[in-house]
A protein has these predicted regions:
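Short, charged, intrinsically disordered terminal tails
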Residues: 2-9, 95-98
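C-terminal structural segments of small proteins and small subunits
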Residues: 66-98
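Long, contiguous binding/interaction regions
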Residues: 2-6, 30, 34, 82-86
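Amphipathic, hydrophobic secondary-structure cores in small proteins
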Residues: 26, 30-78
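Short amphipathic
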Residues: 9-20
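Intrinsic disorder
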Residues: 2-3, 17, 73-74
Length: 98
């Protein structure tokens, strides 16, 4: 795990690899959104140049992030560090699937 980096727009960013066997389908998307919604700041997820609201189940599913996909989580706000840490932990533990 590397430390999040700040981009020019003031967002903390962290690249993550999707590790679970099925990628981000409905259940992992719901878990991601439930976690993201605990934070007050803005959270986005980017894959292959497409950026979606990280608090949207449909948006996450539309990214079609399969196993091994690289996604970037962007967070901004007073709790951005904590948001990225918790979302990274969720992804790294394979959404509790495997």
């Amino acid at each position: 795990m590397s430390a999040p980096k700040a981009n020019d727009a003031g967002f903390l960013t962290q690249e993550l690899t999707i590790l679970n066997k099925s990628g981000i389908h409905a259940r992992p998307a719901a878990m991601f959104v439930k976690t993201a919604n605990r934070f007050t700041g803005d959270i986005f997820v980017e894959k292959d140049g497409e950026k979606i609201n990280g608090k949207s189940i449909m948006g996450l599913m539309m990214l079609a992030a399969g196993p091994g996909s690289k996604v970037t989580v962007l967070a901004k706000g007073s709790d951005a560090d904590a948001a990225i840490a918790e979302l990274e932990a969720l992804v790294n533990r394979k959404f509790d699937e495997d």
